[in-house]
Amino acid sequence: MFPMVTEFMNYGQQTVRAARYIGQGFMITLSHANRLPVTIQYPYEKLITSERFRGRIHFEFDKCIACEVCVRVCPIDLPVVDWKLETDIRKKRLLNYSIDFGICIFCGNCVEYCPTNCLSMTEEYELSTYDRHELNYNQIALGRLPISIIDDYTIRTILNLPEIKT
């Protein structure tokens, strides 16, 4: 008789424990129900990037002195700088500057070490193309002013800040 009573008590304890675990899982599910959705409708909604975001590189042709510091600090020697030495004034004249964004790792070393600040990072991150050769930007494409998402009235911008719990 006693083994039957102990088995029944064991069964009751296991039932209570299982109900408690199910209740804990349900409480976690309910706590997540009040949160905002994580997904965004991408073409129509875009996240506002942070101030230090590393997007497409912007290049100012007039400021560049063709010192090639950007090439030396790049971990993959990516920027292609073509220049000609002007013998009468003993200065380099920049002929062509290009970066292949298909290879670029967006480390930002070229921007950080540029002595004339002719390179800067923008908030543009939409660089996808159907042909990888279109990702090779010359000085004209690099000099194009960045498109700001904040100024586009057709796109709903979403601030990407962590929630502060009070």
From Swiss-Prot:
Q: Which cofactor does it need?
A: [4Fe-4S] cluster
Annotated residues that bind [4Fe-4S] cluster 2 are located at: C74, C104, C107, C110
Compartments annotated for it: namely:
Plastid, Chloroplast thylakoid membrane
Q: Which UniProt keywords apply?
A: 4Fe-4S, Chloroplast, Iron, Iron-sulfur, Membrane, Metal-binding, NAD, NADP, Plastid, Plastoquinone, Quinone, Repeat, Thylakoid, Translocase
- Tell me where the signal peptide lies: none
Q: Which GO terms describe its biological process?
A: photosynthesis, light reaction
**Family, similarity comment:** Belongs to the complex I 23 kDa subunit family.
Functionally, this protein is described as follows: NDH shuttles electrons from NAD(P)H:plastoquinone, via FMN and iron-sulfur (Fe-S) centers, to quinones in the photosynthetic chain and possibly in a chloroplast respiratory chain. The immediate electron acceptor for the enzyme in this species is believed to be plastoquinone. Couples the redox reaction to proton translocation, and thus conserves the redox energy in a proton gradient.
Whom does it interact with, and what assembly results? NDH is composed of at least 16 different subunits, 5 of which are encoded in the nucleus.
- Name by which UniProt lists this protein: NAD(P)H-quinone oxidoreductase subunit I, chloroplastic
Q: Which organism is it from?
A: Trilisa paniculata
